[in-house]
Protein backbone atom coordinates (compact mmCIF):
# COMPACT_ATOMS: atom_id res chain seq x y z
CA UNK A 1 0.00 0.00 0.00
CA UNK A 2 1.79 3.11 -1.23
CA UNK A 3 -1.07 5.56 -0.96
CA UNK A 4 -0.58 7.76 2.11
CA UNK A 5 -3.52 10.13 1.68
CA UNK A 6 -6.35 7.77 2.48
CA UNK A 7 -10.07 8.39 2.67
CA UNK A 8 -11.67 6.82 5.71
CA UNK A 9 -15.25 5.60 5.97
CA UNK A 10 -16.87 4.83 9.32
CA UNK A 11 -19.90 2.53 9.47
CA UNK A 12 -21.73 3.16 12.74
CA UNK A 13 -22.78 6.16 14.80
CA UNK A 14 -22.76 4.86 18.34
CA UNK A 15 -20.29 5.96 21.01
CA UNK A 16 -17.31 4.19 19.48
CA UNK A 17 -18.16 5.25 15.91
CA UNK A 18 -18.55 8.87 17.04
CA UNK A 19 -15.27 8.72 18.98
CA UNK A 20 -13.44 7.32 15.95
CA UNK A 21 -14.88 10.10 13.77
CA UNK A 22 -13.58 12.65 16.30
CA UNK A 23 -10.09 11.12 16.32
CA UNK A 24 -9.89 10.79 12.54
CA UNK A 25 -10.97 14.40 12.02
CA UNK A 26 -7.86 15.52 13.93
CA UNK A 27 -5.47 14.27 11.22
CA UNK A 28 -7.41 13.57 8.06
CA UNK A 29 -8.97 15.85 5.50
CA UNK A 30 -11.90 13.71 4.46
CA UNK A 31 -13.90 11.22 6.47
CA UNK A 32 -17.07 9.56 5.19
CA UNK A 33 -19.62 8.54 7.81
CA UNK A 34 -22.53 6.19 7.31
CA UNK A 35 -25.47 6.91 9.60
CA UNK A 36 -28.64 5.00 8.81
CA UNK A 37 -31.05 7.44 10.48
CA UNK A 38 -31.85 10.58 8.43
CA UNK A 39 -33.08 12.47 11.52
CA UNK A 40 -29.70 11.92 13.20
CA UNK A 41 -27.90 13.11 10.06
CA UNK A 42 -30.03 16.26 9.98
CA UNK A 43 -29.36 16.94 13.68
CA UNK A 44 -25.61 16.40 13.36
CA UNK A 45 -25.43 18.54 10.22
CA UNK A 46 -27.28 21.38 11.95
CA UNK A 47 -25.68 21.18 15.42
CA UNK A 48 -22.24 19.50 14.95
CA UNK A 49 -23.12 16.98 17.69
CA UNK A 50 -24.42 13.41 17.72
CA UNK A 51 -27.75 13.66 19.61
CA UNK A 52 -27.60 10.10 20.96
CA UNK A 53 -23.96 9.35 21.78
CA UNK A 54 -21.17 11.52 23.15
CA UNK A 55 -23.44 14.52 22.66
CA UNK A 56 -20.88 16.90 24.20
CA UNK A 57 -18.40 16.21 21.38
CA UNK A 58 -18.26 18.94 18.75
CA UNK A 59 -17.59 17.40 15.36
CA UNK A 60 -15.50 19.05 12.63
CA UNK A 61 -18.14 18.91 9.92
CA UNK A 62 -15.90 20.54 7.30
CA UNK A 63 -13.94 17.28 7.25
CA UNK A 64 -16.87 14.87 7.55
CA UNK A 65 -19.22 13.79 4.76
CA UNK A 66 -22.29 12.12 6.27
CA UNK A 67 -24.55 9.85 4.25
CA UNK A 68 -27.41 7.45 4.85
CA UNK A 69 -26.23 5.51 1.78
CA UNK A 70 -23.75 2.87 2.90
CA UNK A 71 -22.64 2.23 -0.69
CA UNK A 72 -21.68 5.88 -1.20
CA UNK A 73 -19.59 5.81 1.98
CA UNK A 74 -17.91 2.51 1.12
CA UNK A 75 -17.40 3.39 -2.54
CA UNK A 76 -15.75 6.73 -1.68
CA UNK A 77 -13.43 5.35 1.01
CA UNK A 78 -10.13 3.47 0.96
CA UNK A 79 -10.33 2.35 4.59
CA UNK A 80 -13.66 1.10 5.95
CA UNK A 81 -14.03 1.04 9.73
CA UNK A 82 -16.84 -1.18 10.95
CA UNK A 83 -18.04 0.22 14.29
CA UNK A 84 -21.46 -1.33 14.82
CA UNK A 85 -22.44 -3.79 17.55
CA UNK A 86 -21.58 -7.33 16.44
CA UNK A 87 -25.25 -8.34 16.62
CA UNK A 88 -26.01 -5.92 13.74
CA UNK A 89 -22.86 -6.30 11.66
CA UNK A 90 -24.28 -8.86 9.23
CA UNK A 91 -27.41 -6.76 8.65
CA UNK A 92 -25.31 -3.69 7.81
CA UNK A 93 -22.76 -5.59 5.71
CA UNK A 94 -25.51 -7.15 3.58
CA UNK A 95 -26.49 -3.62 2.47
CA UNK A 96 -23.11 -3.19 0.76
CA UNK A 97 -23.44 -3.73 -2.98
CA UNK A 98 -20.06 -2.38 -4.10
CA UNK A 99 -17.02 -4.65 -4.28
CA UNK A 100 -14.98 -4.31 -1.09
CA UNK A 101 -12.40 -7.02 -1.80
CA UNK A 102 -9.69 -4.40 -2.48
CA UNK A 103 -10.62 -2.11 0.44
CA UNK A 104 -8.76 -1.89 3.72
CA UNK A 105 -11.16 -3.12 6.40
CA UNK A 106 -10.77 -2.21 10.06
CA UNK A 107 -12.76 -4.02 12.73
CA UNK A 108 -13.88 -1.90 15.67
CA UNK A 109 -16.47 -4.34 16.98
CA UNK A 110 -16.32 -6.82 19.83
CA UNK A 111 -17.04 -10.51 19.66
CA UNK A 112 -17.91 -12.92 16.90
CA UNK A 113 -20.24 -12.45 13.96
CA UNK A 114 -23.37 -14.09 15.42
CA UNK A 115 -24.70 -15.85 12.31
CA UNK A 116 -21.36 -17.44 11.43
CA UNK A 117 -19.57 -17.63 14.80
CA UNK A 118 -16.46 -16.40 13.00
CA UNK A 119 -14.05 -13.68 14.00
CA UNK A 120 -14.79 -10.62 11.89
CA UNK A 121 -11.58 -11.00 9.85
CA UNK A 122 -12.43 -14.61 9.03
CA UNK A 123 -15.96 -13.53 8.11
CA UNK A 124 -14.60 -10.84 5.77
CA UNK A 125 -12.24 -13.30 4.08
CA UNK A 126 -14.90 -15.98 3.62
CA UNK A 127 -17.87 -13.84 2.56
CA UNK A 128 -16.30 -10.71 0.99
CA UNK A 129 -12.91 -11.93 -0.32
CA UNK A 130 -11.02 -9.35 1.75
CA UNK A 131 -7.35 -10.28 1.97
CA UNK A 132 -5.97 -10.77 5.47
CA UNK A 133 -3.23 -8.32 4.37
CA UNK A 134 -5.91 -5.61 4.09
CA UNK A 135 -7.52 -6.33 7.44
CA UNK A 136 -6.92 -4.53 10.75
CA UNK A 137 -8.43 -4.49 14.21
CA UNK A 138 -8.62 -1.51 16.55
CA UNK A 139 -9.09 -1.60 20.28
CA UNK A 140 -8.31 0.06 23.58
CA UNK A 141 -7.43 0.20 26.33
CA UNK A 142 -9.52 3.33 26.06
CA UNK A 143 -13.21 4.12 26.14
CA UNK A 144 -15.22 6.33 23.82
CA UNK A 145 -16.04 8.64 26.72
CA UNK A 146 -12.32 9.22 27.43
CA UNK A 147 -11.76 10.12 23.79
CA UNK A 148 -14.70 12.54 23.91
CA UNK A 149 -13.10 14.34 26.85
CA UNK A 150 -9.70 14.34 25.09
CA UNK A 151 -8.13 12.46 27.98
CA UNK A 152 -4.79 10.94 27.12
CA UNK A 153 -5.76 7.54 25.77
CA UNK A 154 -4.16 4.60 24.03
CA UNK A 155 -5.26 2.56 21.03
CA UNK A 156 -3.82 -0.64 19.65
CA UNK A 157 -4.17 -1.32 15.96
CA UNK A 158 -3.32 -4.82 14.80
CA UNK A 159 -2.73 -6.39 11.40
CA UNK A 160 -0.67 -9.24 10.01
CA UNK A 161 0.54 -6.60 7.51
CA UNK A 162 2.73 -4.52 9.84
CA UNK A 163 3.63 -1.87 7.24
CA UNK A 164 -0.07 -1.19 6.58
CA UNK A 165 -0.69 -1.24 10.31
CA UNK A 166 1.95 1.45 10.91
CA UNK A 167 0.57 3.60 8.07
CA UNK A 168 -2.98 3.43 9.43
CA UNK A 169 -1.85 3.87 13.04
CA UNK A 170 -0.28 7.22 12.14
CA UNK A 171 -3.70 8.46 10.97
CA UNK A 172 -5.11 8.00 14.49
CA UNK A 173 -2.30 9.56 16.54
CA UNK A 174 -3.08 13.03 17.88
CA UNK A 175 -2.44 15.16 20.98
CA UNK A 176 -4.66 12.96 23.16
CA UNK A 177 -4.29 9.56 21.44
CA UNK A 178 -1.19 7.37 21.42
CA UNK A 179 -1.26 4.38 19.09
CA UNK A 180 0.61 1.09 19.17
CA UNK A 181 0.90 -0.90 15.95
CA UNK A 182 0.87 -4.66 16.48
CA UNK A 183 1.05 -7.74 14.27
CA UNK A 184 -1.44 -9.51 16.57
CA UNK A 185 -4.98 -9.45 15.20
CA UNK A 186 -6.61 -11.69 17.81
Positions of PLM-derived features:
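Short, hinge-like loop/turn segments at secondary-structure boundaries
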Residues: 48-53, 123-124, 152-156
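A short helix-to-beta-strand connector/capping loop
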Residues: 57-66, 130-134, 175-177
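Short helix-loop capping/hinge motifs at secondary-structure junctions, enriched
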Residues: 162-166
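NAD(P)+-binding Rossmann beta1-loop-alpha1 motif at the extreme N-terminus of oxidoreductases
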Residues: 1-57, 63-68, 74
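Rossmann-like NAD(P)(H) cofactor-binding subdomain of soluble oxidoreductases
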Residues: 70-75, 79-152, 168-169
Amino acid sequence: MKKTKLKFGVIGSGSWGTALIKILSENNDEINWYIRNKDNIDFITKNSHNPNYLSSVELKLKKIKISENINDVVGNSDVIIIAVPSEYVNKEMKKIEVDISDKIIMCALKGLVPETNLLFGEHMQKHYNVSIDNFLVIGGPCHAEEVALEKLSYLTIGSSNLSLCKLISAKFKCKYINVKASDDVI
